Amino acid sequence: MLYLVGLGLSDETDITVKGLEVVKKAERVYLEAYTSILLVDQATLESYYGRPIVVADREMVESNSDEILRDADKVDVAFCVVGDPFGATTHTDLVLRARELGIQVRTVPNASIMSGIGAAGLQLYNFGQTVSMVFFLDNWRPASFYDRIKENRSIGLHTLVLLDIKVKEQSLENMARGRKIYEPPRYMTVGTCAQQMLEIEEEKQEGVYGPESLAIGCARVGGKTEKFVSGTLKELCDADDLLGPPLHSLILLGRRTHELEHDFVREFAVNKENWDRIWKAEYCGKQ
């Protein structure tokens, strides 16, 4: 059987009891290592789980899934995913391939950023579509997130923005030459995300959000050093030092925000007076 095991958001102890039982009995244990990261290293996981772990990069999962699924019709294979197993479509694809091979699949869920983000103080049912922000290049500045934020904002909903992770990526030159040389890992920060959002608004000029739109920067959600910083998008452009190391994400507030949410989030504000002023003018009582 193929088990998809969620590992939670932070460290080795976030795995569920059921998930740990699966990992301990499985013939092989894989760790998906490119859609997100835990805040501890592979050796720490192996020590806690009492099992060797094979790191599965994007190439293995997307191009060599037969190795992961090898003999899974006869033995148990654990495919471990940071957060919840179905936070990325790649894992749906792995399940579909397993089904084609007649392999049974079972999921062991866990907390993900989609649920853990509630710690920022906003009600989860007031979130709209989640969007992703990738690193801009000189000749590539994808802005599909903008229209989704526009839809969310039109009905007063918050937007969770998930930030880019570059792990085991190749430069165009190395890719073209077929060289297995990889760039150092890169993790987008809230500051970069906020700046890129404002650049796209400057281009679009549709007033979906602006420098004084309220937002929350989130760092290491679910971990011991979890951190939230709230302020305007302009303020968050310079908030990386306050937030600290990765992983980061960002929430753009919608106008359907309750007073209790305001009071909760206000405690994270870079400038409480500025936060109160904008809240009263643009958010309080608005839909």
From Swiss-Prot:
SUPFAM superfamilies, sorted: Tetrapyrrole methylase
Matching HAMAP family, A to Z? Diphthine_synth (MF_01084)
Q: Its biological function?
A: S-adenosyl-L-methionine-dependent methyltransferase that catalyzes four methylations of the modified target histidine residue in translation elongation factor 2 (EF-2), to form an intermediate called diphthine methyl ester. The four successive methylation reactions represent the second step of diphthamide biosynthesis.
Q: Which family does it belong to?
A: Belongs to the diphthine synthase family.
Task: Specify the domain of life of the species encoding this protein.
Answer: Eukaryota
UniProt-listed InterPro entries: 4pyrrol_Mease, 4pyrrol_Methylase_sf, 4pyrrole_Mease_sub1, 4pyrrole_Mease_sub2, Dphthn_synthase
In alphabetical order, the GO MF annotations are: diphthine methyl ester synthase activity
Please cite one Gene Ontology biological process associated with this protein: protein histidyl modification to diphthamide
Tell me yes or no: is Cytoplasm among this UniProt entry's keywords: yes
What is the name listed in the Swiss-Prot or TrEMBL entry for this protein?
A: Diphthine methyl ester synthase
In the Enzyme Commission scheme, what number(s) does this protein have? 2.1.1.314
| Organism annotation | Neurospora crassa (strain ATCC 24698 / 74-OR23-1A / CBS 708.71 / DSM 1257 / FGSC 987)
What reactions does this protein catalyze? 2-[(3S)-amino-3-carboxypropyl]-L-histidyl-[translation elongation factor 2] + 4 S-adenosyl-L-methionine = diphthine methyl ester-[translation elongation factor 2] + 4 S-adenosyl-L-homocysteine + 3 H(+)
Upper lineage is: Eukaryota, Fungi, Dikarya, Ascomycota, Pezizomycotina
Which keywords, in A-to-Z order, does the entry hold? Cytoplasm, Methyltransferase, S-adenosyl-L-methionine, Transferase
Instruction: Give one Pfam family.
Output: TP_methylase
State the pathway, as annotated in the record: Protein modification; peptidyl-diphthamide biosynthesis
**Residues annotated as binding S-adenosyl-L-methionine:** L9, D84, G87, S112, I113, L163, V221, H248
One GO CC term, this protein: cytoplasm
Which class of enzymes does this protein belong to? transferase
Q: Where in the cell is it found?
A: Cytoplasm
Keyword Cytoplasm included in the entry's annotation: yes
